[in-house]
């Protein structure tokens, strides 16, 4: 029997279904919520990715390059958190979101301090907990935005923070290394220490977002927590598609992490400005935001899904061409295309794809 998501979830007597109306103009509402979410996840990146600016040249662990080891360790922690999040995020009550954000950010910064304090090679374990503590943050922040008529554009604004903040985190890390002469092991803690209090403040700001209105719920359906039985019923109904999407998303996550972690080793960073990563990622961010904004205004949910899949497939084709070595490009253009193509595919899944998927199955 083909059950809709609403039937699987049902109405919850303990949830207020849009009893208040929002009087804030839509454009101001989008700027407020989208901007806060964008800054929040940018700060998450500052806690997770500044170490990618370091090369750790000449260091090894058990015969393997040190940076490869720490990147793998952090990625394992991050993926483990994603798997735990399937259960945890779906059951997280709204009143506990801020506690989760503060606790996760605190554990992340503590792990970065441990990375600087502990001797080699034992400090690599600290980055496992760094990845573990931050792997669910996307889902928690996104839960403040979902279930609204403006969710597509809000999610797009939040999503492009990944493209923007990645370059900014690297540029901050390179600035700390090259201009402030901070060691490669303490640089992540310095950048993370600046981000931690700001992320806590942004988390508090998100608790002030208004609830979805009656019009939001009528257009997008109410979002409530799911217990184990409801999750299993939903998974069984869409199992083949969800498994394919899960594998694709996992591979994109790994591919993006490899690119983010080792790009400073692939190119000669001594020949470029420390802020080139931030500049290129800002341009890519504007392209992505424009693309997702156009799709956000489409009411044909199935057409949007097909468009996102088409864009993702095309971007992977361009990446394959770049990786083949058949095309000779300047460093700047190569970096830009790498960022744009990976983020088109990755952010499609992270932002509006699953929101529209839920609406198609409504």
Predicted regions and their residues:
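C-terminal ends and interior cores of transmembrane alpha-helices
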Residues: 104-119, 312-327
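Transmembrane alpha-helices of Major Facilitator/SLC transporters
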Residues: 273-300, 315
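Hydrophobic core of transmembrane alpha-helices in multi-pass small-molecule transporters
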Residues: 122-137, 328-346
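Extracytoplasmic gate region of multi-pass secondary transporters
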Residues: 49, 240-272
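Central cavity-lining transmembrane alpha-helices of secondary-active solute carriers
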Residues: 68-89, 283-291
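Glycine-rich segments within core transmembrane alpha-helices of 12-TM secondary carriers
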Residues: 151-178, 194-195
